[in-house]
């Protein structure tokens, strides 16, 4: 583990999520969320429309299922180097079970997410296999300041609110993040966090910017891409040692909630491992809450 990774892990472990896993006490009944989010960096524009429906059994247990739709627009440089064109398509359909607990000061949540391989592997929208992610989140409130932390284990790296990744992976990973947010006003919050993805064992890296060709899938490729950049920039599907799939970085953001059921957010993420500078943005709409508030 290099020095940058150790620093990020320390930041995560000792930091006193803009988007907590349980941002408020859930209302019992059916839920319906729409979220559109994206990332812009040196490799292109990566956006996703995510539709989720579910049911809150009570304040402690909820179930949900959803389907993301991806839109990938490679940068001019990527198109020139590897000939990639724009691509759209569905991702993996997923199901979730979430356990929650809350007091006046602390929120905790444990979420199990399982996906089925419905996305196109050649476009990088799926690993071609079912995936499982178990994430555990907490936050503590001290007035306007809310530190948070999360640790999880999975067999594939996932996108986050801060980073729509230009790739996905197959193989065991541990992921951690931590930081804090500050409530500037009733509808405005800012925050910062650090994250780390720590793989174990060989990893299959599947690119969303390098398309599959007759010779691009190499089960034993050791290509390291260009310099500090990731193999996913030039190779569509390759098996690499864990070090080449490791990632760590930092994020900062602003969130505005003009209404109880609508969130706008945007910010910056720096992947120090892959030298990627990403501007991210998104809008989330709690359609279920809007419908209930209108008495439908």
Language-model regions, residue ranges each:
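Gram-negative (and chloroplast) outer-membrane scaffold detector with strong preference
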Residues: 87-120, 130-147, 182-190
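Transmembrane beta-strands of outer-membrane beta-barrel proteins
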Residues: 30-34, 63-65, 95, 108-112, ...
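Outer-membrane beta-barrel translocator domains and adjoining extracellular loop/strand segments
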Residues: 44-50, 74-81, 110, 120-128, ...
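Outer-membrane beta-barrel strand-turn architecture
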Residues: 53-61, 89, 101-106, 140-144, ...
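Residues that define the transmembrane beta-barrel architecture of outer-membrane proteins
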Residues: 45-49, 87-93, 126-132, 157, ...
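Transmembrane beta-strands of outer-membrane beta-barrel pores
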Residues: 36-42, 67-73, 101, 114-120, ...
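Short glycine/proline- and aromatic-enriched beta-strand/turn motifs that initiate or cap beta-hairpins
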Residues: 20-57, 63, 70, 97
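Outer membrane beta-barrel transmembrane domains
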Residues: 74-78, 170, 175, 179-296
């Amino acid at each position: 583990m290099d020095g940058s990774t150790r620093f990020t892990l320390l930041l995560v472990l000792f930091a006193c999520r803009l988007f907590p896993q349980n941002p408020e006490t859930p209302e019992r009944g059916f839920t319906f969320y729409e979220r559109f989010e994206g990332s812009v960096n040196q490799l292109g524009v990566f956006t996703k429309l995510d539709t989720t429906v579910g049911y809150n059994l009570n304040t402690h247990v909820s179930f949900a299922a959803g389907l993301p739709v991806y839109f990938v627009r490679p940068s001019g440089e990527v198109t020139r180097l590897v000939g990639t064109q724009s691509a759209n398509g569905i991702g993996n359909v997923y199901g979730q079970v979430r356990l929650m607990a809350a007091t006046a000061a602390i929120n905790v949540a444990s979420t199990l997410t399982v996906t089925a391989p419905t996305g196109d592997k050649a476009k990088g929208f799926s690993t071609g296999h079912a995936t499982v992610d178990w994430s555990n989140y907490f936050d503590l409130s001290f007035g306007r300041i809310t530190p948070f932390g999360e640790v999880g284990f999975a067999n594939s790296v996932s996108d986050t609110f801060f980073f729509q990744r230009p790739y996905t992976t197959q193989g065991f990973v541990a992921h951690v993040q931590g930081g804090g947010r500050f409530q500037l006003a009733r509808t405005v919050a800012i925050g910062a966090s650090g994250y780390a993805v720590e793989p174990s064992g060989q990893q299959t890296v599947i690119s969303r910017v390098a398309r599959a060709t007759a010779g691009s899938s190499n089960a034993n490729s050791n290509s390291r891409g260009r310099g500090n950049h990731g193999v996913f920039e030039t190779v569509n599907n390759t098996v690499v040692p864990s070090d080449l799939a490791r990632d760590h970085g930092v994020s900062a953001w602003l969130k505005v909630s003009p209404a109880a059921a609508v969130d706008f957010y945007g910010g910056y993420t720096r992947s120090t491992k892959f030298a990627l500078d990403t501007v991210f943005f998104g809008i989330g709409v709690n359609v279920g809450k809007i419908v209930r508030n209108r008495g439908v």
